[in-house]
């Protein structure tokens, strides 16, 4: 099953057919939007008296979510880039294939030509430190096998209700404050969602391999910043 990412049929085919034997032999695996774990917590408290009521609410969510480029994922696939002409994949001979990365053993790696010994060692060190790659040495990476880091968000709501009597009926005026991503308001280093620049970490030019470590950064968007909204509401009885 293809995740459906892409605004055109051709882009969905060329960028989402993760495999090791060509696009006509697609790999089964986890969809990119399936989060292994998700935690939701909603707490509310209401303090009322004859003149009105104070309402407090906290909403907490934690899930494994991040970005690659401008698309959000819960899972991602480690892949290898093949430099070839006319968009032809030199490994699978397939225009639409995205090569799943083979994770070599130490002995296999020693026999692979790299642009430099330092680059080869950097690749091995990355494998050893990565929780997914280190558990699958000697195998192909799975489609959607790697999981994004945890993302935490905390939202806060406060509203104050004032009761007013209109012709013997109790109406309510409510003043509200909603803060989205409260943690980020308290500390700019909290409540940030991370972005990975690429999951294609190995390149083959027909002669040598080149390893490029992925870079993580803050995803500069509204999901990584706090916001506040004031509201007023009148409720008729």
Place the predicted regions along the sequence by residue.
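Gram-negative outer-membrane beta-barrel transporters
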Residues: 1-72
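Outer-membrane beta-barrel strand-turn architecture
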Residues: 35, 47-50, 62, 162-166, ...
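Residues on the lipid-exposed face of transmembrane beta-strands in outer-membrane beta-barrel proteins
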Residues: 41-45, 156-160, 177-179, 230-234
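Residues that define the transmembrane beta-barrel architecture of outer-membrane proteins
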Residues: 35-39, 150-154, 171, 224-228
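Extracytoplasmic gating/loop element in the C-terminal half of outer-membrane beta-barrel translocons
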Residues: 55-167, 174, 202-203, 209-216
């Amino acid at each position: 099953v293809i995740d459906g990412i892409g605004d055109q049929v051709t882009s969905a085919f060329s960028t989402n057919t993760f495999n090791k034997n060509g696009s006509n032999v697609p790999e089964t695996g986890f969809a990119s939007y399936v989060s292994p774990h998700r935690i939701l917590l909603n707490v509310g408290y209401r303090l009322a008296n004859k003149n009105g009521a104070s309402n407090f609410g906290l909403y907490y969510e934690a899930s494994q979510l991040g970005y690659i480029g401008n698309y959000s994922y819960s899972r991602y696939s480690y892949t290898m880039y093949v430099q070839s002409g006319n968009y032809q994949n030199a490994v699978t001979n397939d225009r639409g294939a995205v090569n799943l990365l083979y994770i070599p053993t130490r002995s296999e790696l020693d026999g692979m030509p790299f642009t430099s010994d330092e680059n080869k060692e950097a690749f091995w060190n990355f494998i050893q430190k990565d929780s997914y790659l280190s558990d699958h040495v000697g195998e192909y990476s799975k489609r959607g096998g790697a999981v994004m880091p945890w993302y935490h968000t905390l939202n806060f709501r406060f509203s104050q209700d004032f009761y007013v009597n209109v012709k013997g009926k109790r109406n309510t005026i409510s003043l509200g404050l909603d803060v989205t991503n409260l943690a980020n308001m308290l500390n700019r280093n909290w409540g940030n969602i991370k972005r990975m620049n690429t999951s294609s970490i190995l390149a083959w030019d027909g002669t040598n391999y080149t390893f490029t470590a992925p870079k993580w950064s803050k995803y500069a968007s509204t999901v990584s910043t706090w916001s506040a909204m004031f509201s007023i509401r009148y409720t008729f009885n």
